[in-house]
């Protein structure tokens, strides 16, 4: 099991409940695949450095988790097919 960190930005058109529902969805992907979520830091709505997909702000979330090496690929796939995700990044923690 390795430690990972992911940051993702969600569309600002979501309301607060939609934002939290998406975060719970990604947490459940990790937990259903046998991983554990160590920390979730909701940064809230922030301005982007530049426009992405014609939006200039988004909901930022930082999530730390522990999982096997296949889970980040599955989480990346889920991020890509979720329309509300503007940007995401998954890195391995040393």
Swiss-Prot record:
Domain of life according to the entry: Bacteria
Keyword line: Ribonucleoprotein, Ribosomal protein, RNA-binding, rRNA-binding
Coiled coil feature spans: none
Gene3D superfamilies for this protein: 3.30.70.60
Keyword RNA-binding annotated: yes
GO CC terms: cytoplasm; ribonucleoprotein complex; ribosome
One Gene Ontology term from the biological process aspect of the record: translation
Any one GO molecular function term: structural constituent of ribosome
Pfam families cross-referenced by the UniProt entry: Ribosomal_S6
Family to which the UniProt record says this protein belongs: Belongs to the bacterial ribosomal protein bS6 family.
Function comment: Binds together with bS18 to 16S ribosomal RNA.
Protein name per the record: Small ribosomal subunit protein bS6
Organism: Clostridium botulinum (strain 657 / Type Ba4)
Lineage, highest ranks first: Bacteria, Bacillati, Bacillota, Clostridia, Eubacteriales
């Amino acid at each position: 099991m390795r430690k990972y960190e992911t940051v993702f930005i969600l569309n600002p058109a979501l309301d607060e409940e939609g934002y939290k529902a998406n975060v719970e969805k990604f947490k459940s992907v990790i937990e259903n695949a046998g991983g554990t979520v160590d920390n979730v830091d909701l940064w809230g709505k922030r301005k982007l450095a530049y426009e992405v997909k014609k939006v200039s702000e988004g909901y930022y979330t930082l999530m730390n988790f522990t999982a096997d090496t296949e889970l980040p690929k599955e989480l990346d796939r889920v991020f890509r097919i979720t329309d509300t995700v503007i940007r995401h990044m998954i890195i391995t923690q040393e």
